[in-house]
Amino acid sequence: KRLLEDLGIKINEIIPEGASVKNLINLPQAWFNIVPYREVGLMTASFLQKDFGMPYILTTPMGIIDTADFIRQVQKNVNKLAPFFLKKTFDFESYIDYQTKFV
């Protein structure tokens, strides 16, 4: 959650964390989904991709390499729609470099 906020990404919904059936109506508003735990959410993400064309990210941002890969996947998915809706693209490489500089 904090990582996405650091990148300036607005979180649409966190399911199942504190969510109810009423929150499900907001799911199609997301540009992509994140499935940090395959045991919880993979079936839903697969359904949303199949029926609504909504991509998902399976990489869990733990450790330097997986976190960098996760951020690059977020960037790829954001940049599919950002030029149309926000009239710009995003480059998170400087964030990755800064976060890994002293490790």
From Swiss-Prot:
Comment on bound cofactor: Binds 1 [4Fe-4S] cluster per heterodimer. The cluster is bound at the heterodimer interface by residues from both subunits.
One GO molecular-function entry: metal ion binding
Biological pathway: Porphyrin-containing compound metabolism; chlorophyll biosynthesis (light-independent)
GO terms for biological process, alphabetical: light-independent chlorophyll biosynthetic process; photosynthesis
InterPro entries: ChlB/BchB/BchZ, Nase/OxRdtase_comp1
GO annotation, cellular component aspect: chloroplast
Location(s), subcellular: Plastid, Chloroplast
Major location category of this protein: plastid
Catalytic activity: chlorophyllide a + oxidized 2[4Fe-4S]-[ferredoxin] + 2 ADP + 2 phosphate = protochlorophyllide a + reduced 2[4Fe-4S]-[ferredoxin] + 2 ATP + 2 H2O
Cofactor(s) named in the record: [4Fe-4S] cluster
The enzyme's E.C. designation: 1.3.7.7
Keywords, ordered alphabetically: 4Fe-4S, ATP-binding, Chlorophyll biosynthesis, Chloroplast, Iron, Iron-sulfur, Metal-binding, Nucleotide-binding, Oxidoreductase, Photosynthesis, Plastid
Family recorded in the similarity comment: Belongs to the ChlB/BchB/BchZ family.
Subunit structure, as described in the record: Protochlorophyllide reductase is composed of three subunits; ChlL, ChlN and ChlB. Forms a heterotetramer of two ChlB and two ChlN subunits.
Function, as annotated: Component of the dark-operative protochlorophyllide reductase (DPOR) that uses Mg-ATP and reduced ferredoxin to reduce ring D of protochlorophyllide (Pchlide) to form chlorophyllide a (Chlide). This reaction is light-independent. The NB-protein (ChlN-ChlB) is the catalytic component of the complex.
Name under which the protein is recorded: Light-independent protochlorophyllide reductase subunit B
